[in-house]
């Protein structure tokens, strides 16, 4: 049976976010090579913005900020900005950026489904997905800029979902262009996994207190994850081999305070 709270929540989120509340801005960690935009191109862009309808883009009315790591490389972590469209009561699709400015780079996509749909998936498919319960209960997953009651309702809904995430532009590895092949990403499932400095950098920039958020979410029921999800914890690591050698996963350094955070340990 569809969950009516998500439909109501979608209206709440849309009304708030369309008003422009999105919190502090986060810059991309890389500069894209290429010639500056010419006046003619600017006019073309402005004309397209005025004349062309963009229903799929207009549907991206929810903003989530959280963290991912490369499947098989749990120490290589980064902040991820999700701009999401609620397709129905049980399915959400998100475009993932490495920041929240107009020049942020598209890092990848995440598909989010409710536990009812996840339970129907074949076991081999489940291994590609990660649970969201800990991300919610820990306070690491946030919805910047919306009122606390709306965020709490959203997190209550997301606690029962699973995500499948692919990153295609690895700016956390200082790639100024989308090189290499897509990589499967995962989410944290327990304390001690996320780089605390990475989380703190994000928290300071967005004005978030994760400890306080965690307390406020103590009343959210977190289901036991399906045993087919988070397969990396069981030693089942699925990843695409990269013939270009791009994904050597070099240790990263910290980024400036106003820039997308990443692990550096």
Describe the residue ranges of each PLM region.
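Bacterial N-terminal signal peptides that target proteins for export
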Residues: 1-9
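C-terminal motif of bacterial Sec signal peptides marking the signal peptidase cleavage site
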Residues: 17-20
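Bacterial signal peptide processing site
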Residues: 22-24
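N-terminal secretory signal peptides
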Residues: 33-98
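Alpha-helical membrane-anchoring segments
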Residues: 54-61, 66-78, 104-105, 112-117, ...
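An exposed acidic His-Trp-rich patch
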Residues: 100-186, 191
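Eukaryotic, polar/proline-rich low-complexity intrinsically disordered regions
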Residues: 161-168, 172, 176, 191-195, ...
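A cross-kingdom marker for long, charged
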Residues: 213-265
């Amino acid at each position: 049976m569809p969950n009516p709270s998500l439909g109501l929540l979608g209206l709440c989120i849309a009304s708030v976010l369309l008003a422009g509340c999105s919190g502090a801005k986060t810059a991309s960690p890389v500069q894209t090579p290429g010639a500056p935009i010419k006046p003619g191109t600017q006019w073309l862009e402005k004309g397209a913005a005025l004349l062309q309808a963009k229903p799929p883009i207009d549907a991206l009315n929810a903003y989530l900020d959280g963290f991912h790591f490369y499947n098989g490389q749990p120490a290589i972590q980064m902040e991820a900005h999700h701009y999401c469209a609620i397709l129905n009561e049980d399915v959400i699709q998100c475009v993932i950026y490495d920041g929240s400015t107009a020049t942020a780079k598209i890092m990848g996509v995440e598909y989010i489904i409710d536990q009812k749909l996840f339970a129907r998936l074949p076991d081999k498919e489940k291994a590609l997905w990660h649970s969201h319960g800990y991300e919610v209960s820990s306070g690491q997953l946030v919805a910047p800029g919306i009122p606390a009651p709306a965020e709490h309702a959203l997190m209550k809904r997301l606690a029962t979902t699973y995500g499948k995430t692919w990153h295609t532009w690895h700016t956390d590895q200082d790639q100024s262009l989308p090189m290499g092949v897509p990589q499967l990403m995962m989410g944290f499932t327990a304390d001690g996994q996320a780089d605390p400095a990475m989380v703190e950098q994000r928290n300071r920039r967005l004005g978030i207190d994760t400890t306080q958020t965690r307390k406020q979410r103590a009343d959210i029921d977190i289901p036991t994850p399906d045993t087919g999800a988070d397969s990396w914890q069981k030693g089942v690591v699925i990843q695409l081999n990269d013939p270009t050698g791009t994904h050597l996963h070099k240790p990263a350094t910290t980024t400036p305070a106003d820039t997308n955070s990443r692990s550096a340990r």
